[in-house]
């Protein structure tokens, strides 16, 4: 199994459809996706464009949908929830389609939407995704970070390194293909005993801290291997627990 890591959507090669892709946005889109599905959401549909999201959402009854979105870490006007994993409680999302648009994560999902198998991962469901990849046994896996407005993010690279490290520990056949992932594994080894500390010193972590008290979000996003949910794309742009 060959593993590659791309810091942001723009780094993903053109003209190639990977066998398997894993998209990461630790703070906070893929953590929110994992918790929404864990808490009983029927599905999560992701959009890079807010107007497209609103048009699609109009086709659903109000009782069958919930709108989740943020820009710059703040809830979008007219949306039900911002991009917090704590907001997608069972009372809010159970049985509903979550229509979601965020600053960074939804762009990366859009970029690799044609992958043969597409998953989303956060630190809470790292082990579950690793187990699924072991079961699928693809020849090649692209791990795609989300970054911040097109630039590198520490926390996504930490999670990429966490996934690769776990797979390397469990499979002799794993090959790390690029330096980006090798550096991410080293980053994980350095911070694996203080995951929340890494999230807090990251520039996006500092950005979140600067716009309000996000202590509970940090704790949730830093939790490791406590969810068994596996968000998988079942149709273009639509994720469901698989």
Swiss-Prot record:
Keyword list, A-Z: Hydrolase, Magnesium
Keyword Hydrolase appears in the UniProt entry: yes
Cofactor: Mg(2+)
Gene3D superfamilies (alphabetical): ComB-like
Catalytic activity: (2R)-O-phospho-3-sulfolactate + H2O = (2R)-3-sulfolactate + phosphate
Database matches in InterPro entries: ComB-like, ComB-like_sf
Gene Ontology molecular function: 2-phosphosulfolactate phosphatase activity; magnesium ion binding; sulfopyruvate decarboxylase activity
Protein family membership: Belongs to the ComB family.
Protein's UniProt name: Probable 2-phosphosulfolactate phosphatase
Natural source organism: Prochlorococcus marinus (strain NATL2A)
Taxon lineage: Bacteria, Bacillati, Cyanobacteriota, Cyanophyceae, Synechococcales
């Amino acid at each position: 199994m060959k593993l590659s890591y791309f810091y942001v959507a723009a780094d993903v090669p053109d003209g190639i459809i990977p066998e398997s892709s894993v998209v990461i946005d630790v703070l906070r889109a893929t953590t929110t996706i994992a918790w929404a599905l864990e808490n009983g959401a029927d599905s999560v549909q992701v959009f890079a464009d807010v107007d497209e999201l609103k048009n699609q959402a109009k086709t659903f009854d109000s009782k069958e949908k919930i709108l989740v979105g943020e820009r710059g870490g703040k809830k979008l006007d007219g949306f039900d929830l911002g991009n917090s994993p704590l907001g997608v409680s069972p009372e809010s999302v159970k049985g509903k389609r979550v229509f979601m648009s965020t600053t960074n994560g939804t762009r990366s999902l859009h970029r690799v939407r044609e992958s043969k198998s597409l998953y989303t991962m956060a630190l809470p469901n790292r082990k579950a995704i690793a187990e699924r990849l072991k079961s699928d046994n693809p020849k090649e896996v692209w791990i795609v970070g989300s970054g911040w407005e097109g630039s590198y993010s520490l926390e996504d690279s930490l999670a990429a390194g966490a996934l690769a490290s776990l797979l390397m520990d469990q499979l002799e056949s794993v090959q790390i293909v690029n330096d980006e992932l090798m550096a991410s594994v080293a980053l994980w080894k350095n911070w694996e005993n203080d995951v929340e500390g890494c999230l807090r010193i990251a520039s996006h972590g500092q950005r979140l801290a600067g716009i309000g008290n996000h202590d509970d979000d940090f704790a949730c996003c830093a939790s490791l291997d406590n969810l068994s949910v596996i968000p998988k794309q079942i149709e273009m742009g639509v994720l469901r627990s698989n």
